[in-house]
Structures are given as C-alpha cells and as structure tokens.
Amino acid sequence: MRLDQAIAARFPDLSRRKARELIAAGRVLVNQRPVRVASRFVADSDQLTVAGDLPAIEVLASGDDWVAVNKPAGMPVQPTRDRATLSLEEMLRVEHREIFLVHRLDTPTSGVVLFARTREAAAQFSELFAGGAIRKTYLAVIGGTIERETTIDAPIDGKEALTIVRPLRDSLVEVEIKTGRTHQIRVHLASIGHPVAGDRRYGGPSAPRLMLHAWKLQHESIGEIEAPIPPELSDRWPGGASPPPVAPGFPRAE
C-alpha cells in the first residue's frame, strides 16, 4: 500500500490529501525515520508515526558531527511502546535524516542530550561516555539536606557506580556522576536517605515533576554545554544569583 493511503487508513482523522501534506513536510516517520515520498510502498508490519505540529526543541550547541538539545521533562529520548508520545530522537530525525543517540536521560528528567550526526561520531562519543571522559553534571532537589560534599561509591546491578553530591542551597544539590548506570542518581540519593523530590519509584517527597535536571556536559571535543535551569529549580537560587560554575577550563559551546 502507498504511504499516503496507509496513513489515511490507519489514522481515520486524516484525509489522504492531508496525509500527503504531512509526508511532504517530513512529518511522517516510517520505522522511526522521516519519509517524504507519498508513493512509497509500506507493509502492514511497518511502524508509522505522524508527527503533526512538532513542539520546538531547543538546540543548545552543535558541531560538524554532533548536536546538543534541551530535552523537556516527560519526553522520552527514544521511541517507546506507548506511541502516544513522540520521542526526542524521532523529532530530531524530522530535521536531521541521520541522527544517533549516544547517551540517555530518563523520561521524567530534563536537560542536555547529545546526539551524533554520523555513525563514526556516534561510536566515538559512545566510547567517551562509557569511559567517563565526558563530565556530566546534574541539579536535583532532594528530600532533606546534606551538609557537605558526599561521595557515593556503591555498585548498581553488580557494576561500579560513583556519584558525587555537593550541597548548594537548602535541598538543592549539584550531582556529578562518574559512571552511567540506570537510574544511578536516583538510586544513590535514595540509598543515603535523600531521594530526589518527585521520585515515586524511590520514595521521594511530593513534587510537580521529578526534580532532576541534566545541567552540563563538558569535554574538550564539545566544550561546555549548559541546559537552562527550569524555573522550578532556578527559583531556589538565593537572591537571583547566578548558579556556580561546575569546573574551569572548558570554553562555552556556541
């Protein structure tokens, strides 16, 4: 069946004419990749996604072979079984035919996510992340307060996991992770009795959202990339002061 016919058949609210318009605009994805040819044949087993009017994704910085964007809280990084929500990866593929995810954030976490533009760059960045060469700094609101910098060195699922927590103000903390285990920050903070606010899974105090934000990525290949701090976290800075720098020596990415 032609793609425009398949879209009209699977999405009763869309006419075939509207389907062709969406296809031409690059807002129809076949198996997670945009297709702009209405006459393309698709099989019943092909996964079709209609992007419609896409929300704007803020590009924080970019290079020849990479792009960094600001992920909103609640948006999955990758396609999920629940097709009701379009993923960040799918939306970027509308604009960038070739895009490769090199690390992940949990769906409820906001902040900077790095994508590669080529397979070669993806392999290189994946290796850098796996080896801990790219510095990853988060902001979190936790249950209770901590008085001094705390290092949590505790395996997760049998694998090494290292987290450094620095108090900023009241329950706001800066978190640096040296490894990248699943839910690492959430697991480690809960393990010391200070779960992330809004984290139902690990017993965090009530909050409008998971109060965890991927603030900065730093490496000589990308410079320093910073995601704007959401109001629910930035409101906690005293007297409108600017957040403290994470580390010197990295030029800010433009």
Q: What do these predicted ranges mean?
A:
Residues 19, 84-92, 118-121, 170-223, ...:
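Pseudouridine synthase
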